[in-house]
Amino acid sequence: MAHLDTREKLAILADAAKYDASCASSGTTKRSSVGGKGIGSTEGMGICHSYAPDGRCISLLKILLTNACIFDCHYCINRRSSNVRRARFTVDEVVRLTLAFYKRNYIEGLFLSSGIIGSPDYTMEAMVRVARTLRLDHDFRGYIHLKTIPDAAPELLEEAGLYADRLSINIELPT
């Protein structure tokens, strides 16, 4: 992977996260907002809307930890053989981005998924570190939704549940 700055990574990994239907953005095209750069544009990098357990609509930073993957699932845009630009955040980059967006009131939480790098456990452990660092090191009280990584160790899923408000299972269905 070429060296990318945080903004370039955000553009790639927010765009790659849009294929996850469990956190959909508004999808509006009102007032030519799609593709616009003005106030009210609905194409904010990585911002989506979801519903909290209490029913409130909340804005989330929706990103992938990486869009690189060791698997080659034919239905997945991020499959190993896919000709897409690859990027990968570090744990610290995700933490810094989340806090920066949160402190500016752009978001109320984080939605984090990932391609699988190294192994399912390696990837899930990195995602858990993001949530744990936000909660314990930064006293983050915002919402955290983690997509679990298939075949990750049950202990990692249990630990993820200690820090995330919501866990969801990554079940892919071809269309």
Functional labels for PLM-detected ranges:
Residues 48-51, 100, 157:
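Short, flexible, glycine/charge-rich loop motifs used to bind or transfer phosphoryl groups or to couple energy/partner
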Residues 59, 72-75, 87:
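Short N-terminal amphipathic alpha-helices
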